[in-house]
């Protein structure tokens, strides 16, 4: 990462530091500025502390419009960039992140959420900016590509002063991380083949699936993550329910993008099943699975199979745990 050890604070996942930094830097006098759509956790947290929420539409290439975000409110307390973005998978290049760091409102902090960065070929980490005098905090997690969502491991990168403010003035991070979780994280970091192999698998599945959808006439977001959005030309929630009748669970929709559900990318076999179900649903053919039969089937499955019964959405939860830990 290129930062001193005192610039890193470990947490049980990256959701905890996202809450902490939002509480620390937004208020009724300091707004939260984000892209739209994006990951909503900071939206909810900022509203709990009474901060104004400003959503800035993304560019046509589904990247964050950093110029508009920096100009959105001179009293902004925090600018949040999810890079790559959840749910679109769009990325911002390094020049955009540097622009935001230099041009954000005085007194504000730039938070770059890099939960999905390991899936990207072109997104560059902003972690080094945290040690260069910029008011930047970077968030990372082991819940996505590393497949450790259940173990809960993440960290924040920032100046000691910013980390202390996040942690309530304390030099200690908030939350408890188990030693077994730390061991799993270390094992994953020492496996040099882990990131490139999983990135390649997801990229192949993502490219093939998006190409297939676009050939059928369905627009998709430009993605470098393990997810993307697709315009199904109908209410996304109903489409989600129809796909579930074939045993395929897809992601949710966002306000203003009601016809664009989020799709997570899985293995080759899983994405084939997604395509088969998609074809059937678009032809008006529902499957035999109902909420009742799904519940009965789930009760009969061992835990590992139960996770895979809901296999297309929440890709991170299905990645195999690193076995050398």
For every predicted segment, state its role.
Residues 7, 24-81:
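PLP-dependent aminotransferase-like
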């Amino acid at each position: 990462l290129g930062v001193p050890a005192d610039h890193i604070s470990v947490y049980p996942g990256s959701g905890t530091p996202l809450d902490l930094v939002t509480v620390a830097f937004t208020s009724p006098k300091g707004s939260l500025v984000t892209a739209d759509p994006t990951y909503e956790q900071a939206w909810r947290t900022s509203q709990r502390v009474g901060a104004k929420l400003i959503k800035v539409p993304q560019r046509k290439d589904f990247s964050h419009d950093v110029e508009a975000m920096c100009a959105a409110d001179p009293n902004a307390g925090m600018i949040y960039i999810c890079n790559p973005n959840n749910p679109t998978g769009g990325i911002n290049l390094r020049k955009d992140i540097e622009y935001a760091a230099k041009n954000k409102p005085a007194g504000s902090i730039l938070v770059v959420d890099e939960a999905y960065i390991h899936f990207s070929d072109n997104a560059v980490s902003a972690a080094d900016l945290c040690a260069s005098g910029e008011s930047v905090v970077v968030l990372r997690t082991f819940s996505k590509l590393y497949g450790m969502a259940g173990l809960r491991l993440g960290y924040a990168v920032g100046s000691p002063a910013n980390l202390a403010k996040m942690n309530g003035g304390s030099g200690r991070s908030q939350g408890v991380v188990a030693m077994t979780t730390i061991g799993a994280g270390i094992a994953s970091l020492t496996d040099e083949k882990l990131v490139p192999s999983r990135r390649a698998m997801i990229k192949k599945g993502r490219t093939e699936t998006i190409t297939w959808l676009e050939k059928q006439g369905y627009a998709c977001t430009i993605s470098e993550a393990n997810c993307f959005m697709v315009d199904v030309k109908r209410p996304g929630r109903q489409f989600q329910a129809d796909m579930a009748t074939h045993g395929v669970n897809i992601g949710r929709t966002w306000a203003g993008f009601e016809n664009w559900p989020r799709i997570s990318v899985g293995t080759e076999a899983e994405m084939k099943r997604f395509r088969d179900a998609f074809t059937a649903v678009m032809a008006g053919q529902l499957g035999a699975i109902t909420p009742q039969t799904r519940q009965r089937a789930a009760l009969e499955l061992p835990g590992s199979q139960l996770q895979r019964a809901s296999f297309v959405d929440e890709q991170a939860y299905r990645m195999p745990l690193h076995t050398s830990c």
